[in-house]
């Protein structure tokens, strides 16, 4: 669709826009947009408050203030008269008054006809001046044979009338073409020109006399004090020169317009290309010519601008404004305040200045004022228009308010957080929404949220009004609205009715990842706070200390269905970051389950036998048996499914029988805290706890070891196994095929149809799923049968209506997908119930002092005294004394901790110990502060970059520890000492949160357009993975098992005996991964995102498993956004503190935190600390020698590497190492390119220069994983791979061959491959380039979409380059589609496969006759 969008843009549907292009607006375009000229600076009349005619708010130009009212005669019309002309009066006809709604004031534009040409500010100020690059003006100064390039500053002076330029020499030798005449040299230049001109005329002639007089006057002025200070009269001299010769000298936008008019773009292009070829030859001859490289880069930039104009076919003169558009009135409102005062948008003030100056210029011109006055007025007009376009970028003379605040210009309204892109296009305010404080809702089911009645009444108002009118409770909308406002009791039944099958979406800010927005079924509550299910709080990172959440309501049937199928809390059980459940019980629930699962030897009722589960419960209620007593039940009472094959009696505690009763009958029985792989360990456990008939139970139980109760980690493992067993395996369509074949006569015996179905892996359904599906189907059919019988008898052979089948399908589908959540709800209820019954409380007597504390403290004090003695004798330095003291106190605190651990080991009845051991709250570190010693405190000393580079000791820890515990009480000095650490902790957290949020934003912009778009890209280029090992500590950071699980293999995997363990092209599940690792295989080649062939996207096989669903990723999944969120969300947990490591600000401290992560992702060239030296060759370390120099500060080592050249000759390379750097190699070691020779961070560009992209990819992956794993955060490789792929997605061209690429230009790697493929197929010379690494800050700016790039940063620069090249945005990514109001090309709007999670068809469609 190539329709040009002009005044008729309102008629074009936004959904029909397929691509967007920018171009320079011509004066004719502006007139076409405009409804009239604004020629008066007034806004509104101070008496009537009505807009002034011809002013900035004129109703005739910008539209009426009142709907369908004539702005001339004031007559009112109906909506049907819209867009017609008012002909009520003669004046109406003359003025052409149009009948419009007041919405017209949001899109009707005006214009100001400028009385002088004005150069658009962006084109000479942004990105080193587009005008300067395009004109590329050069001048031959004097006798010089090398031309001088006119700088952008000189051109700016020209635009602002500070200097003049020679446009035509007229054959005068004293005037060089394009010479800028500055005030300092003007006198001499003009004098020489006039002397040259006078020779053309005979002496005594009128012209000769006039010129002689001018030369005499000029000589007098230049020699006078005034002339030296203020310069000559340019304008008079220009007129004389133009009158008596064909030379032409001018200034301002007129001069630029003349130059732009004369420029021959194609000739300029040829000249630049010829100059480039010459520079390139010189560079090839001598690679070290830096100045030539800089010259080449400047020429390329110029060529880029010239080509942009040639390819877009635009006239460069259009950069000059003749008609200035005036934006619609309601986009720059004027608001009335109290006391007849007004507040106005800054734009109005800027427009007012332009109109005043423009009108004044018009008057001066009409009055034939002196040229100098007119030129000054033109300069002021140029400055006024500049201020309107971009006031912030003006280096001087910014237009400010009385208070000195710079006015907000149109550019400022586009850029930044509060600009159009980020505030209004990417982040809009949403209708049908509200917010309130959250409180816990312990009685809610997992898919429910408590919505306050008052909020529901407002949010669902339109539906409630419809219901009230339909049921004749009110007669009009107005009455219904009043009833809702007054909270009339009549409305509440209707509120309850309308919220059925209407999900709500809850969002908690900051929205760090997709689990911060989830959907729920609303349950009305009478309070004013939203009730939240306790298990979903982890996803939202919410607590109940005053947190607020926003509520949103999906309205359309499609939105409701999408919300229910994709956003309900029961679909968000696994965290996308690592694929582990995020809904694990915590705090009270953990404490209750810990208490419930405790075992106690010799408890009341131990060894009792009960014939039924109910009998045991009754005995427990009558207190004849304790909760922790081990009792016996018949096996068939506990596990009837297994009892068919196994008989006997089962031993466990009353609590564990209660706990296991909530799990489905076919789930393994939980005996103890050994819950890893319950299915596999089940047979061995059953032998131990299932006794044959006739056994002496009491005697057997007395000899049985007491098991540990379930703690938080064990419960999390159980939740994972519940998910793996009961997560839905079928698609909705599969269940629909069964329902379609059932009727009331056969539904009980034909549920066997489920056995014929196959799950997403093409395997038979497991027994738990078959039994549950049968149970749900029989129950729902019987419920429907009873419901229909109420209206009369129902025949058994009656065929169900389509809508009845759809209703059944929805209910069965919900129950089937809710199996995991229903078990989790039971666990939650049990946890809360028994934490209450446990009676856990805290008393000061629960805190037991560390037995050997004082011995340890005494030992520490003696050690410190010795250190002080050594220091006083000069045996150690002050820094050494400090470091040793810190190390000693750290060790003492650890000793006290170990002592405390031993003392509380068997104290299971202590409430504090129970909380700690269960994982409900607190840990041993908190307990040490309570009962041992507080230990070392942080100081607010900041480690600087220079400290890291010089390995200085930074005293970021208070040397004297807090020896008291909280139980003993702190001394006043200790209390004061601990305040520093508390403040540092708070400030660090605040700073870290902001930095982490900015990191997430950058990452989202880097990867936003990466979506899974295909099944397979058929790449044969794999990625070899092995254990990621930290070479310094020799520990495994990420094991091979984690790296291959859920990924596709690129090659077959064989064990040492040659037996195939897994085939190429198959996905590695957990069992296969364990098999591969058990076989001792160290390296596996997998399919990777880093080698996927799909442009700007990824295929299913290169991505592998979707961690959030635990199955193969679906086409349409926005994996780029998920990757950015998964890396950014835990960013706040990454510590920025270095004090905990012992006070020395060395490289090791710095490399472990947030700072290093930013360095890697932004590809910093100057990282913290001394960068590591790396080997540039394959070779051997032959010598490491001391570097002895006179200056002691420069001591160090020389490492000699012996390597072979390309001619197979031996050569040596010597690398200098500073003494403070730690060596990682020794003589005789073999080294490879990119290998570290000393400790320190590697600079990414250096690594890429000596090795290849794959080495850099591995380094980045390892380093980023190391940073997160050091903090105990696990992130999947694939997310980091997506970001790394984007960082290495650009190629810098070094030879352009027969392509259209420029040497030195940066192009997308996929475009590079595509163009080269075409050239090779045509037997032409391909281009050659090097892969370059770009940081997260630069990648979004290099995007193919100017909308996405402009909404990120450097908006004006991106837009300027897009305009001059008429760049086309094909709307392929996510951001650009949101900006233009389209659905994003992902999820349910993508080309998803049938039966995938995005296939959310209307359930009726499965039963429609034409669908069969």
UniProtKB/Swiss-Prot annotation:
Catalytic activity, as annotated: RNA(n) + a ribonucleoside 5'-triphosphate = RNA(n+1) + diphosphate
Q: Which domain of life is it from?
A: Bacteria
Cofactor binding summary note:
Binds 1 Mg(2+) ion per subunit. Binds 1 Zn(2+) ion per subunit; 2 are expected compared to other organisms.
Its signal peptide is none
Q: Provide the Gene Ontology terms for cellular component.
A: DNA-directed RNA polymerase complex
SMART domains given for it? RPOLA_N (SM00663)
Q: Which Gene3D superfamilies match?
A: 1.10.132.30, 1.10.150.390, 1.10.1790.20, 1.10.40.90, 2.40.40.20, 2.40.50.100, RNA polymerase II, clamp domain (4.10.860.120), RNA polymerase Rpb1, domain 3 (1.10.274.100)
Annotated residues that bind Mg(2+) are located at: 543, 545, 547
Q: Which family does it belong to?
A: Belongs to the RNA polymerase beta' chain family.
Its subunit composition reads:
The RNAP catalytic core consists of 2 alpha, 1 beta, 1 beta' and 1 omega subunit. When a sigma factor is associated with the core the holoenzyme is formed, which can initiate transcription.
User: What name does the UniProt record give this protein?
Assistant: DNA-directed RNA polymerase subunit beta'
